[in-house]
Each structure stands twice: as C-alpha cells, then as structure tokens.
Design a protein with these regions (language model features):
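Short amphipathic alpha-helix that is part of the acyltransferase structural core
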Residues: 2-43, 48-53, 57-61
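A short beta-turn/loop motif at secondary-structure boundaries
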Residues: 44-49, 72, 140-141
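Conserved beta-strand in the GNAT
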Residues: 55, 61-70, 77-84
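A conserved beta-turn-beta hairpin within the catalytic core of GNAT-like acetyltransferases
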Residues: 71-80, 90, 109-113, 142-145
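Conserved acetyl-CoA-binding loop-helix of GNAT-fold acetyltransferases
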Residues: 85, 91-104
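Conserved short alpha-helix immediately C-terminal to the canonical SAM/SAH-binding motif I
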Residues: 98, 123-126
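Conserved GNAT acetyl-CoA-binding A-motif
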Residues: 99, 106-119
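Conserved catalytic-core motifs of GNAT/GCN5-like acyltransferases
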Residues: 116-118, 128, 133-148
C-alpha cells in the first residue's frame, strides 16, 4: 500500500485560484529561471491554458508541480512537463509521488496509450524509476541536455 502525502491538487487552468496561479508561476520561476537560467520567454510558453496542473501546496508554497499537456500540443501523445520540486522539499520522494499521481490521473482520464516527456538528463533515473524509457539521443533544450522518454500505459 502506498501512503500518499496530502494536499495534492489537479486542476484545469480556469480552476486555479489567482493565489495558486501566482504560486505556480513563482515556483517555476525559482526553479527554471533562477536555478537553471532558462529565459522567461522559453519558460512561459503560452501552453498553460491548455494544460492540467498537478501541484502540492506545503508551508504556503507550491512545493512541487508538473503539468499535463494534452495530445497534439507539443507531441502527438499526451505529455508531462515543467516537472519541479522546490529545493527545500527535494530528496523526500515528492517528485516520484507526483509522477505516480499524474500518471494515474492520465490513465483514468485520457484515452492514450503512451505518455511522452522531454527529460533533463540529470533526472533520467527519476523517470526510469516510474517506468519511463529513453527513446532519443541527448539534445539541447534551453541550453540544458535533455532526452525524449516515454511510458506505455
């Protein structure tokens, strides 16, 4: 039996409160723009309105976040992107739990047989631990080494 942390939320863009949206943008900016030096124009890509947002609120912050990108937007299959855990919440199993919850949601709510993602190479082991397999050579995205991975569902 898996014991899950409380406070996981899964919402469409128009279901997010302004406070939640602000928290998500702030966490994404902290991780992707400040830590990883990705430029704002690449991080804020205009797809959020089409996505489903998975996040964990802890200590008044969005501690962990990812988004589900519908089939046909970016990839021909459904995809998971913008995966993050704030620095102070890392190394606690939160990312793996979030991916498991996200994949369960996709399996229950979408008719697709594959989930695709563009993984930062340093996080490859995390994605493999929840069943993803690498399907590409390493490539650069926003100046960071990535590889395409997928999981059959």
């Amino acid at each position: 039996m898996t014991i899950r942390m409380k406070n996981w939320q899964i919402k469409k863009f128009d279901e997010l409160s302004l406070t939640q949206l602000y928290g998500i943008v702030r966490s994404r900016c902290n991780v992707f723009i400040q830590e990883q030096k990705i430029v704002c124009e690449e991080e804020i890509d205009g797809l959020d309105h089409e996505c489903i947002h998975v996040f964990l609120e802890e200590e008044g912050k969005i501690a962990a976040y990812c988004r589900i990108v519908p089939k046909g937007i970016g990839y021909e299959n459904i995809s998971i992107g913008r995966v993050l855990v704030l620095k102070e919440f890392r190394r606690k199993g939160i990312a793996q739990e979030m991916l498991e919850i996200t994949m369960e949601y996709i399996e229950r709510n979408f008719e697709d047989n594959k989930i695709v993602l563009s993984a930062q190479v340093y996080a490859k082991d995390l994605y493999e631990s929840v069943g993803f397999m690498g399907v590409s050579e390493i490539y650069e995205e926003a100046g960071i080494p990535h590889m395409k991975m997928y999981k059959n569902i």
